[in-house]
Amino acid sequence: MSMKGQETRGFQSEVKQLLHLMIHSLYSNKEIFLRELISNASDAADKLRFRALSHPELFEGDGELRVRLSFDKEKRTLTLSDNGIGMSREEVIDNLGTIAKSGTKAFLESIGSDQAKDSQLIGQFGVGFYSAFIVADKVTVRTRAAGAPADAGVFWESAGEGDYTIADITKEDRGTEITLHLREGEDEYLDNWRLRSVISKYSDHIALPVEIESKNEEDGTVTWEKINKAQALWTRGKAEITDDEYKAFYKHIAHDFTDPLIWSHNRVEGKQEYTSLLYIPAQAPWDMWNRDHKHGLKLYVQRVFIMDDAEQFMPNYLRFVRGLIDSNDLPLNVSREILQDSRVTQNLRSALTKRVLQMLEKLAKDDAEKYQQFWQQFGMALKEGPAEDGSNKDTIAKLLRFASTHTDSSAQTVSLEDYVSRMAEGQEKIYYITADSYAAAKNSPHLELFRKKGIEVLLLSDRIDEWMMSYLTEFDGKAFQSVSKADDSLNKLADEERPEQQEADKALEPFVERVKTLLGERVKDVRLTHRLTDTPAIVTTDADEMSTQMAKLFAAAGQQAPEVKYIFELNPEHSLVKRAADVADDTQFAEWVELLLDQALLAERGTLEDPNQFIRRMNQLLTA
């Protein structure tokens, strides 16, 4: 084999690290290399079929796509060859010498020394071609892109360490041939029946025929025997597909090592004709919160693969859903731009979204423990739903889970239906509080009245919660009410209409006016409150005022937020408030009021503009 333009190049540093981790972490599950390489061949065939729709000459007179396996016991090599799209020299460098995934470095840094956990993480990352090095100490690739001349072939070879060799060669047939030079002790992959077993286990469901070489020992003739069903799984009837086949297909399209949590396979006929196969993974992908995270479904049109990651069919808050859609109503030459504006796409998106929400509703109803597993992985994404998808807001609300004062646990297990079923007699609203942490929410002075009255409060401490609640206004006819905002219903709960309270409050009116005069424009108002039992003072906001948590969200995003003007509420029955009311000296009075206000602000915001001044006042009054 004559080679031209030969050069040796170094691997990208992340490739070296990934190869090392794979060989050590995935060895116990080493047979997956065959699944990964056959999966790549299947993708190469799909891409060729799609390109050939507009350029049939790419088939080069050979439209029967397949992948073939052969082995040589003497040379101890295993070879996989496909007649798919193939690669150019630039594509070989890009695909085999680098990892073009954003966040790769951070991902690799997150890998530790726990091998079981590492293998799951690496599998989730999608090892693809590099999995060959689990069983091979040298890998040789010969490839030629479809439509390119024979002398545009490419040779690539590496021992999976620091570098690889690349050169130009002549290759008559298009596609890719990968030869694995097996490590010592890997002779099981030189056995016909062992290879058949692995292929049946992992690749029965893919549409690409997988053929294995059979040699006639008498005359030496070679035949190729198809060993997988080679029928697209989603085109088969549900009754004839086993759970194991569904799970294997999920691992093929998601490049995940773990079984999916649930799935739904549906064929729809009538106004629109399509087949969908949707999966909810058991764990979140490592890069789900990465801005560049690819998501969406595989799109097929009339069983012809069109594209990966077609995000137009699923809203962003369901970006964790994996699977495919095979539509009869879209044109074969569809592009992402056409999809964006297509009425067919919008109708499919609506139907598929409802299907996923129904899957989750059923899971929540039938298996609370499994749903809790889902919530721990994807609850934060689902919380984006009320803002993003108004038409399904009520359904999404039923799927949300919260921590609450009822459970005394940070676990988010309480549904809104649970809450409503436990509402106190005469209670008209669903009460909640948002805070920076579960502990801050649980110990907030705003909850004192509710604990006294035995009324449940939802404890919200995820960063997204305040934003979500600005869209989630009511559930089952009951309005949501933040306990940190002023509201008439809270006054009713506090029995502030009792004559004896009104009389006592009237006696403190001069004190309230004195506090107002002292604080001036720094607060919106000063009031007495009977919502508190153990705390001397709190700050609240009006219903139409931006909340503390929302202001923090704006600040974290680097945006200018209007200053929050608080209402300063004082507990007239608390000894510190009584003591402050009795102070005649204006300077001392100011110290007491400032201390009470700082305490209230600290409880509400978690920070003070001048903590040193607060400490000074505290020390001074403690030693007075």
From Swiss-Prot:
Its main location: cytoplasm. Coiled coil: none annotated. Residues 1-336 are annotated as: A. It is found in: Cytoplasm. It comes from the Bacteria. GO terms for cellular component: cytoplasm. Residues 337-552 are annotated as: B. Residues 553-624 are annotated as: C. One of its GO terms (molecular function) is ATP-dependent protein folding chaperone. The keyword Nucleotide-binding applies. InterPro entries: HATPase_C_sf, Heat_shock_protein_90_CS, HSP90_C, Hsp90_fam, Hsp90_N, Ribosomal_Su5_D2-typ_SF. Keywords: ATP-binding, Chaperone, Cytoplasm, Nucleotide-binding, Stress response. Homodimer. Molecular chaperone. Has ATPase activity. Belongs to the heat shock protein 90 family. This is Chaperone protein HtpG. It comes from Yersinia enterocolitica serotype O:8 / biotype 1B (strain NCTC 13174 / 8081). The gene is htpG.
